[in-house]
Amino acid sequence: MCPVPSFTPGETDASAGRPSASQWHHDAVTLARQQQIQVVAHRGASDEAPEHTLAAYRRAIEDGADALECDVRLTADGHLVCVHDRRVNRTSNGRGAVSALELADLAALDFGSWKNSEASRTSTEGPDWEDTSVLTLERLLELVADAGRRVELAIETKHPTRWAGQVEERLLMLLKRFGLDAPTGAPDAPSPVRVMSFSARSLHRIQAASPHLPTVYLMQFVSPRHRDGRLPRGVPIAGPGIRIVRSHPGYVEKLKRAGHQVHVWTVNEPEDVDLCVGLGVDAIITNRPRAVLHQLGRG
């Protein structure tokens, strides 16, 4: 009888090509993390279609995104629309501040032609996007409701704005109309909607009016008061940018130790996806949901 080869954890049975016990454990942990990480489409599948358009969000749902991210701004006549910038100049064929324009003014603009111009630089024939008029949050909520599966929504309030707290007031009114301002189903079931902001004041307004809605504190840098992993009072989820995670990977552990979930934005490069998986983040917010899902073995 041939002797059974032995090896200690951390080694590999080279002759048989079998991974060691520690490698098996590492791979199992990595696989589990990949399956658990939520993939969030940043402004829709915005690498493939014009950001914040129905086309981008439809593509994200088709690609299998777990959640959709959007920015909301209030128009002059009180409608919440999905636009990132304060002004429409970059992403439409118009000009002016969203807060100074009425919905009818925005509806007359093309929010897809800039992407066509961008695509034409690398292709002889640019794509002909459909559904690229301004997108209201109401229409996006309808799309999610009709998705045929659970699709969560991460809504970012943009501040400062001339409308201040009216943004949160209108947002909660709209969520209430869709039955999304309070837990649905089992009492401990996670909410399908969360509200994000760089403004702690915005999140406090949401918490005061609708304490069951999860909130996310977004960060471009880590302020001294939050270096130990603390967040503004009552906020359960941290939203650091990928630059923070690259420069200070240990910060994720501090946030986790403080009991917070970690949702990282905007994660587009494969090496950054690997970094986030290794650190055990809870959500990856990306312009490329299909590519990230594929990298996580879920595509």
Whereabouts are the PLM-identified features?
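Phosphate-group recognition and catalysis centered on beta-loop-alpha active-site segments
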Residues: 3-299
